[in-house]
From Swiss-Prot:
Similarity comment text for this entry: Belongs to the complex I 20 kDa subunit family.
GO biological process, one term: electron transport coupled proton transport
Job description of the protein: NDH-1 shuttles electrons from NADH, via FMN and iron-sulfur (Fe-S) centers, to quinones in the respiratory chain. The immediate electron acceptor for the enzyme in this species is believed to be a menaquinone. Couples the redox reaction to proton translocation (for every two electrons transferred, four hydrogen ions are translocated across the cytoplasmic membrane), and thus conserves the redox energy in a proton gradient.
Gene Ontology annotations for the cellular component aspect, listed alphabetically: plasma membrane; respiratory chain complex I
Localization per record: Cell inner membrane
Record-listed E.C. numbers: 7.1.1.-
Protein name from the UniProt record: NADH-quinone oxidoreductase subunit B
Organism: Bacteroides fragilis (strain ATCC 25285 / DSM 2151 / CCUG 4856 / JCM 11019 / LMG 10263 / NCTC 9343 / Onslow / VPI 2553 / EN-2)
Length: 196
């Protein structure tokens, strides 16, 4: 009976692993050597994982938050889409769902929560109040849309939107995450260099 040899695994020293510079250097070398296929497949794999495990942070101030709670019930089963891990801490969340009216006094709090989230981070504006100010848009104390404070990725209209509309908006965000470039290329927050 032949004993299998233990495979030799090349490891990266911890000092090189702490930051992504060594990984980015390896990707740059692969790109220069003509291995774009490998990087493209790696992009697809990472984006598949990220898109199917988006953890929401809910910032609910009105009736849209109640509709979001219906998503967690057995009838709609949020877990099958990868959104079941709702977080109370912005440091653990991938996206923030702004549900309801945002007042001028609440705007700095929302901005602070967004700033505490790790990159890449996404914003979904849910309901007429978050999208455009809703019926309170002419009031002196209401922000007319979350996009005045944060960069919004997906808008879910409705007053309040049905749970199916929530899912449609979340699936739109999943599609958006799947086509982002993780290695190389231009992401949504970056700009293409001029002249290229």
């Amino acid at each position: 009976m032949e004993i299998m040899k233990k495979p030799k695994i090349k490891s990266i020293p911890y000092e090189d692993f702490i930051d992504n510079e060594s990984l980015e250097k390896m990707v740059k070398e692969l790109n220069e050597g003509g291995a774009n296929v490998f990087v493209g497949v790696l992009d697809d794999l990472i984006n598949w994982g990220r898109s199917n495990s988006l953890w929401p942070l809910t910032f609910a101030t009105s009736c849209c938050g109640i509709e979001f709670m219906a998503l967690g019930a057995a009838r709609y089963d949020m877990a099958r889409f990868g959104f079941e891990v709702a977080r109370a801490s912005p440091r653990q969340a991938d996206m923030i769902m702004v549900c309801g009216t945002i007042t001028n006094k609440m705007a700095p709090v929302l901005k602070r929560l967004y700033d505490q989230m790790a990159d890449p981070k996404y914003v979904i504006a849910v309901g007429g109040c978050a999208v455009s100010g809703g019926p309170f848009r002419k009031s002196y104390h209401v922000v007319n849309g979350v996009d005045k404070i944060l960069p919004v990725d997906v808008y879910i209209p409705g007053c309040p939107p049905r749970p199916e509309a929530f899912y449609y908006g979340m699936m739109q965000l999943q599609r958006k995450v799947k086509i982002e470039k993780f290695f190389g290329g231009v992401n949504r927050k970056e700009k293409k260099p001029e002249g290229k």
